[in-house]
Each structure stands twice: as structure tokens, then as C-alpha cells.
Amino acid sequence: MLKAKWQFCDIETAEDLQSMAALFKATTQLAGAFDTETTGLHIIADKPFLFQFGWVGSDLNGYTFAVDFEQTPELARTTVIEWHRLAATLPVYLAHNVKYDLNMLTNIRLPYYGSNLSDTMFYIRYAHDARRPEDGGPPLGLKEYASQFIDGSAKYHEKLLDKEKSDMAKGFNNLLKTKLQKAGCKPPTKYAAKQYTLSVFEDMFKDPVFTADDLPEDAKTVYYDWLNNDIPIWLQNKITSIVESNMIPYNKLNRKELHKYAHYDIVWVLESWLQLDPVLTARDNRLGVEIENQLIQPLVEMERVGFAVNKEYLDNAIPLVKSYILERRQHFYMLAGEELKIGQKVRIREILNTKFNIPVTSTNGEELEQACSEIIRSKISNDYDRDWYAIDFINTLEELRTLEKWYATYMLRFQKDLKYADRLYTTINQVGTVSGRVTSDFQQFPKDTLKTVDGVELFSPRKLIQVSGGEYQAIVYLDYSQIELRFQAMYTILVGHPDTNLCRAYMPFKCHNTSGPFDYKDQNCIKHAYNTDWFYDEQPEKKWVKLDVHGATTKEAFGITEDDPSFKRLRYIGKRVNFANNYGAQYKKSC
């Protein structure tokens, strides 16, 4: 339910701007907000075409305004400059995903540097229990949050725009289908279709290594004719298969409806704040939001630096990896006795159960690793050859999963991003996890070299990223060892319920030396935690040693020692399970 009464206004003339400024000066503001509608999502290459802003007053009257850069460019710039001046006086100035909008304003040389910035996502995180949405926690999406907690119709205008984008994409795609059918093009027999349909095309391009150049010659000719002559220039560079609705930028949609959508974004931001701010106070979590606020501008600056890359190296590596994937698929088909995709989990499980006599219930990596380990240790069957074929089948499956993920998720994506800029850029999410950990879309970027089974290097991420920006000769990688588990151990102490085993993994907790007991608050104890002999309080003759928590989990789960040849590989699974549990994963997802 809305707390404020709202008025909307599009700024179309200088008089509209003057009226807005006069109204601002005549009201007492509780909070303000801003947002941008942009040509795309690239934080450097894209630009805003619509700027919307507003405030809510102490009398709970709210006002939203929008100005269009494409329709009135000079007025729009003047409006943003004037609004920046006014916004600097607000008690709090909000956006939803504020760093993105700050990047957009910087892209048009209208940056905002006020110290009153905040983000509604901070308020959502700190005013709710730390739970994921599937576990009863709040969604972080603005419209998702508003529709759940403020107004059930909050997604109305978004749905209208989504439908318009979907209809536009469908129109382009139907044109391709018609051209293919008129040309008499027939899809390959394995697709079991008499003529090309959109579902056939989608099936073809689901394969991460499939491109338009892999189409049959007649279909390829029609496809490129469609791409070059029927698709607008602003859309051509985004297409790798058929047109998807998310490729249609907002500035190509119905302007009147878009303005309504923009106004309501300000409403949902400020209504969310009105709901959440008193809860934040009641939970005594305001300090957390203040700390997050101080990080906004430094993180924006970090995001805008980007990574210099060796584009030639990437362009050369992509066909190498593609060729190797195709080669390994043939080996996988030979082992399976049929052609199948790595995503056909049910069929793969049937092959493991029947052909190789391996009783697995799923094809997730952990269970397959355990099956391999079991074969090596005790032999599931007495058929030596079949056992090693089974291991080869599982290893090839896992290898292909890695190869295809690297190829599609990273290599092709990077190549696409480099069409718009000469560097790779990442966004940093301050509240992306319920644990409070900072995340980014580069977080899972591979660090190890991608090699063939014979050890031939295919692609090295470290060779992709180049040193730049100063008199440097190397890239330094810094990593805190198991930092979250260390914090979790300390947290159990601070809340008065110490987890003795977890604490002892990292510090001589409830231990002593010749000088006395260990005190985690004592700087001298901390300084000598690892270079002095400490002994357990309950077993004074037994010396304390640090514990590898991930290794301990691995040994317990797989029944192996550190000398086992599989230990290093399986330890990675132990690590994943530990962190999954730390993030609140349910039992079935951890096992």
C-alpha cells in the first residue's frame, strides 16, 4: 500500500524546469531518488536517453519528473545539472542499483559526486532477515520487491514494455522463418523437421559452439541476407542467432508508456525507502547502510577502470577451443555408444546405470567424482576395461562441461563485449549475497589454464589480461584464505556461542602456552598465534595445530587421506560444500 500521494510531470520546456525547482524549494524533503533508462547495459559504452527523478516530502506528498535526452537534449542536460544542485541538499539520495546509474551519468559527462547517495538494495538487505528469496527472504529486484511488499500491480508497466519487446523480436524472427521457407531450405535430418521453424533455430543455437557459419549453405545465405537487410543497424551487432526480446533497448519502445514506467520507478524506490527506513532503525542496522554508502563512489571508480586485454590472443584461442570441443564430443559419443548432449542428464544417468553398472542417482559433479573415486578404490564391477571406460566417460563429461562453460560464458561473452569497448568491465555488487559478501560478474572468472587431455594449452586467462595503467610489469593476485569461514568462527565467539572446532581451525582457541591462555582480543596473542606452541586446555600434553577445514570435509566425505591421488581434485568439492553450507544451502543442494 502506498504511503505517499504522487504527482507526475514530464519536463518538456524551460518553464517546466523552473516550476520543478520552485516546488522543490517550497517543500521539505524526506528523501529523493533518481534513475536512468539507457540504450543498453554496458557500463561504459551505453548512455541514458531518459532521466527521471523525484522526492517525497514530510507531508507525504511525492513528486516525480522525467526529461528525455533524445527529444530535448539541451533541456535534458540543463535539467540534470540543476537537479544535481538541488539533490545535493537532500537528506538521502537514492537509486536502485545506484552505481549503474552513476556510470550512465558519467558516460554523458554529467556525474554526481554528492555524499548523500544510497541504494534501496542496501535497505532491503539490512531491514530484512538474511535469507535468500527461496528461503523466505526478500527479492532484490525493484519491481519484484515492490509487488511483494508495496503494491501488487508494481510490475504492470514493465509487463507492457516486455510484451512490446517480445512482439518486436517475434516480428523479426517470423520474417526470417518466412524467408527460409520461401527459399525451400530444409533443416538437417537430425532435427526431425520438414522445414525451418523458430524452435528448430533455437535448438540449433542452443549448442554453444554453433554459429550462423555452421548453417547449411542455403540457409546461411538466407540468414545473412535477413541479418544485413531486414535487421536495423542498432540491433545487428547484438544478434548471434535469432532476435531475443532482451536485445531490444527501451529507447525503441512506445515513449508514452516508457515515461509512465520511468515515473513509477521513482515511486517504487521512494515507497520502498518509506517502508524500510523505520525498520532499519528498529533493527539498529543503520551503521551497515552507512558503511555501504561510503563504498559507492570508490567502487564506481574501480568499475570504470576495466581490464586491458589481448584481443588478438582471445580471437585466436576461440577457434582452438571450439575445435577441441568438437573433437572431445566425438570421443564422448564413442564412449556412450550414441550421440548425445552433455545436458541430457536423464539419458546420461541411464548409460551410467546400465552400460557401466554405476548406480548414480544424479549427474552432478560431486556424485560423479565420488563414483570415480569408488571405482579407483574398490572397483564397482569385476570388468577392468568397463571400469576404466566408465572413468573416461565421466571425466570426458566433466571436461566438456568445463570447456563449454568457458567457451560460452566467458570467451564468447568477452569477444562480444569487446565490440563495444577496448577493455573488459565488471560490475561490483555490494549486497549480492545474504552473507554480505561483495560479488561481481567476474567472480567466477577462471584462473587456471585450459588445456587438452595431453597438456596442450588452449587458453590462459592470465595471458588474456594485460598489465596497464602505470609502470608495472606484473599482475598481483591477492586472496584471503577462507576469509568467510574465519569470520564465521569469530562471529560464533562474538554472539556468545563459540563453535570450538571451527574456531580451532584458525586460532588456538581454548588453548594456552607458557605465558598463559590464548585471548583473541590480545594483540600479542594474535601476533604469536602461529609461531608459538599452544596446547589444548582439556589435553595439556597435546599441541594445537591449524586445520584445513576444506581438507577435513573432503576426508570425511570421501573416506580418503591427503595421500590419495584424488585428494586435491576432491578437496575442491569439499570447499564448495563448506561455502554452500555457509551461505545457507539446503541439505540436498549441499550433498
Regions found by a protein language model. Give the residues of each.
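Acidic, glycine-rich two-metal-ion catalytic cores of nucleic acid-processing enzymes
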Residues: 2-14, 26, 33-42, 46-48, ...
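Active-site-proximal helix-loop-helix substrate-binding element of RNase H-like nuclease domains
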Residues: 2-12, 42-277, 363, 372, ...
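Short active-site oxyanion
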Residues: 87-93, 338, 472-475
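Phosphate- and divalent-cation-binding pockets in alpha/beta enzyme and binding domains
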Residues: 101-104, 351, 487, 589
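Core structural elements
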Residues: 233-248, 260-277, 282-309, 345-356, ...
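Conserved catalytic core of nucleic-acid polymerases
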Residues: 245-251, 300, 304, 359, ...
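Secondary-structure capping and boundary motifs in well-ordered enzyme cores
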Residues: 250, 254-261, 286-294, 320-324, ...
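Extended, well-ordered alpha-helical scaffold/bundle regions in very large, multi-domain proteins
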Residues: 287-393, 582-591
